Amino acid sequence: MKYLLFLLFLLLKAGTATAQNNLVVNGIPWFDDKGNIVNAHGACIVEENGRYYLFGEWKSDKSNAFPGFSCYSSDDLVNWKFENIVLRVQPEGILGPNRVGERVKVMKCPKTGEYIMLMHADDMEYKDPYIGLATCKTIAGDYQLQGPLLYKGQPVKRWDMGTFQDTDGKGYLLIHHGPVYRLSDDYRSIEAEVAHIKGMGESPAMFKKNGVYFMLTSNLTSWEKNDNFYFTAPQIEGPWTKQGLFCPEGKLTYNSQSTFVFPLKCGNDTIPMFMGDRWSY
């Protein structure tokens, strides 16, 4: 899959050096503008007015319980400024104390101008999953948790998830093991299930290049790394065809799992930039 640019691997706690850098170096800590390690696991990037915003899980060394989602910004994808803990642990509910919050994804809704955040919320034993919904009027502001994302009036009780925003402005929720849902015009609920990709694994991430849709996914090895693979389709509804691995066999996706593909604008072209997270070493 020659279109995929491997440029950014996000560690459990990843970040840039305090001095200005001009090169992304994978596999080592990065540091933000305050000299602190960039802490943004399971992340995504949103471009806004020529600036890049990185959203991820703010991890603690003491517990896997959700402490918040972080936001950093950069004008070069190398030097990062800490912006905010954009969503903190809630007093109660799906992201309350002793809950898990993972795989945060943010999109700007073209109809409303609102920023929509989706995430996997769960209990500490991963037996009470939800797809959660939070919103904000500004990209790096304080997001308000609205509750579970609903489909036909019911919560989506799934775990590994991703999002995709098509060039026509439509937003999609991607779910492990194959479901692809189109969001409503305001991105606050699910409108329809538009595809179900047979043979998919976990950690779904989608992009489009030259009119072809690509879906990346990982094998099922719990916390351990594996060789991720991909599917393609002429339209998001399918038919979807399994194509094989997108990294050399045995490299275990360079010790990462797909989390997001950022459409990086380079002159007149847009290059898919792979983002992977690490769960084990």
Which sequence ranges carry the predicted segments?
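Carbohydrate-active catalytic/glycan-binding domains of CAZyme proteins
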Residues: 19-281
